[in-house]
Amino acid sequence: MFTRVVEMTSKSGKAQDLANTINEKAVPILRKQRGFVDEIVLVSSGDPRVLALSFWDNKGDADEYQREQYQKIHDIVRHLLETEPEIRTFDVHTSTAHKVTGKQAA
């Protein structure tokens, strides 16, 4: 399993709006992507940061999404962002909620 972590800084007072927009407009697009497993959105209670963690069957599926659909989602949320998102990627080592290929879930 593979994950993309997209760290965003919302405009002042817009973190909840950003999270809601991701849920209402981005998640339906994600659900249609090959290999998409789950999306978790975290909203900071102390600052305007929002993290969007998307889980994928494998890196190839996540890369395909990045090439073919990410810009569309970025355009949907752009008006709520203070800065450009920072994207990091990771192999999932352990999960208690997802089956992780090649590793045993805790």
Label each region the model flagged.
Residues 9-22:
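Short, surface-exposed ligand-recognition loops at beta-strand->loop->(often short) alpha-helix junctions
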Residues 12-14, 60, 93:
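Residues that cap or initiate secondary-structure elements
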Residues 24-25, 29-37, 55-89:
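An amphipathic, aromatic/His-enriched active-site/gating alpha helix that lines ligand/cofactor pockets
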